[in-house]
A protein has these predicted regions:
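N-terminal signal peptide c-region/cleavage motif recognized by signal peptidases
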Residues: 11-13
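Disulfide-rich extracellular domains of secreted proteins
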Residues: 16-131
C-alpha cells in the first residue's frame, strides 16, 4: 500500500520541481534625442515564481525605420545584456532570479534631436527558468 501511494505522488512531485516560464509585454517608449537612453516599463512575472533565469526570448516592434547605431539592452535589476535585432533569444541573464522584472533599454549614440523619433510600439519577453 505504501509503495502504491509513493508511485502515485512521485510524478506530481517531480512536476512541481520542474522548469517554468513567464511572459511579460508592454507598450514601448519614444526616443527623440541621440545620446539619451530610454527604458521600458518593467516586465515582471504575473505571480511570484521561484527559480533562476535560463533562456529568454524577446521581441519588440518599432514604428518606422531603425535608427543607425541603435543599441538595445535587456536589463534585470542588477545586470544588462546587449541584444541584436527585433527578436531573438539570449542566455545573457542566466542565473538571475526569475522573479526579477526586466526592462528594455534603447539608445542611439551621438547628440541632438532625431527625426523621425524612435517609437517602440510594443515589447515582449518570455522568460524560461529552472528551479
Amino acid at each position: 500500500m505504501r509503495a502504491l501511494f509513493l508511485m502515485m505522488f512521485i510524478p506530481f512531485g517531480a512536476l512541481a520541481l520542474g522548469d517554468g516560464a513567464w511572459q511579460g509585454s508592454g507598450v514601448g517608449v519614444m526616443l527623440d534625442h541621440r545620446g539619451v537612453a530610454a527604458s521600458s516599463q518593467p516586465l515582471a512575472p504575473p505571480q511570484p515564481v521561484s527559480g533562476r533565469m535560463s533562456l529568454i526570448a524577446w521581441t519588440y516592434v518599432l514604428d518606422g525605420p531603425t535608427p543607425v547605431g541603435l543599441t538595445v539592452k535587456l536589463c534585470s535589476q542588477t545586470n544588462c545584456t546587449s541584444i541584436d535585432g527585433q527578436s531573438g533569444t539570449t542566455r545573457g541573464l542566466t542565473n538571475t532570479d526569475a522573479n526579477e522584472p526586466l526592462r528594455f533599454v534603447w539608445e542611439v549614440p551621438g547628440g541632438g534631436s532625431m527625426y523621425p523619433p524612435l517609437r517602440v510600439r510594443s515589447n515582449q519577453v518570455i522568460v524560461n527558468y529552472t528551479r
